[in-house]
Amino acid sequence: MPTAVQPDPPSADDAFYVGYDPPMPPPIARVVRRAVWLAVAIGVSAVALVAGRHRAIAGGVFEFGNVQPVTGVVVERPYPALRPRDGRPAVLLVATGKHGAAPLVRGLTDRAVSVRGQRISRDGNEMLEISSIGQNASPGDAPGGAPGAGVVLAVTLRGEIVDSKCFLGVMVPGQGKTHRACASLCLRGGIPPALFVEDRAGESRLVLLVSPAGEAMDPAIVADRAFEATEMAGSLSRADGWWVLRTDPATWRRLAN
């Protein structure tokens, strides 16, 4: 009669596990635990490395939903602004969305008003997205005339044409090629155009762009050049706390990005 052959007892290498049939055999459990801890360690290290190499995105502040009043005298040209009574720099005015405020302040030049809106600010430059305007004084009650412009300098500047609303804080980042389509629409809608310039020391300035006669720029012209590196010459002055460049678009020169 043949002798029955007894199978060898199972070893640790023979462990087999089906995911829906617990418990997990100890040898497999040990391997899984090690793999999980290794994955966690790699993940934490990757997050720390990415965070350490992250560069902060420059931008301003948009106080969305915080409607507050600002009083002052309306300036219609070249771009709508409010000159505060306390002598602080003028606050540029814009409408909601991608629209300038020219239709909202038409006929209110030198009128003292109270404007309710949402503040937009960056590096000391302020803007207000208008919610409502209430006239609270007659022309005769308004504060004195506009502060005189500072020294006029003949300059040649290099920088990028930006829409001031997004750049000052409505969008972060509000500059660069990824923002070009949005900026073009804002400029066509009447948002004041500006030139963002940086000097060799890394100091940056926002310069409002106006025509040689000191009037608002043609929206179509600046919209077509949104966020293009551009060289432009003109007369630079300081007015109402803002840098302003009178320049002829016909003399502008595109620069290689």
Regions found by a protein language model. Name each.
Residues 2-257:
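OB-fold and OB-like single-stranded nucleic-acid-recognition modules
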